[in-house]
Amino acid sequence: MLIHDCTKCSRLHLHLKELKKKFPSYHCKPVTGSGKLSSMVCIVGLAPGLHGANKTGVPFTNDFSGILLREVLHEINLNDFFITNAVRCFPKNNKPSANEKNNCQKFTQKELNKLKKLRVIVTLGEIAYKQIIKVYGLSSNVHKFKHGNIIKLNDQLTLISSYHCSKLNINTGKFSRHMLKDIFLKAMKIVNYG
């Protein structure tokens, strides 16, 4: 099944149909990952933003998180990346259920399997982190989420966890542009020097 055809999560599917009525020009469908399949860096976020990827159909575009993330990536000259989300549909109240997260896991696995040169996965937020841990058969009870954690998933692949670059995290001071930049500088160092 293609991600655009997925209707597995009835709550999300109905929510997107309601949003399409309210915002007829918006994408309002599941959002697939974006970027080059030859990328060595994959960024995994939570889910499409209402006025971001839910509008454009491209992860991390057109909203606060996307603008901040892409500005930082441009600033450090990290232009070759693949970007996706743990949950492919905009979740009501920005809170996907456990079942909705599980339903999207197979799409994440398929995307990651296509990235043959992948060296680093950067997760933005705990939900994305837990999904990647699960995809690689690790336990989130053993590998607890912590900002800046670096975990070797296998001989070729490293996971770096980060807080999400959400407006809430930035405005409350939990996270900063500098912290985000530092995460991606670590990713670039791993790609360039192992």
Q: What is the role of each PLM region?
A:
Residues 1-153, 157-193:
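A polyanion-binding, active-site-adjacent surface
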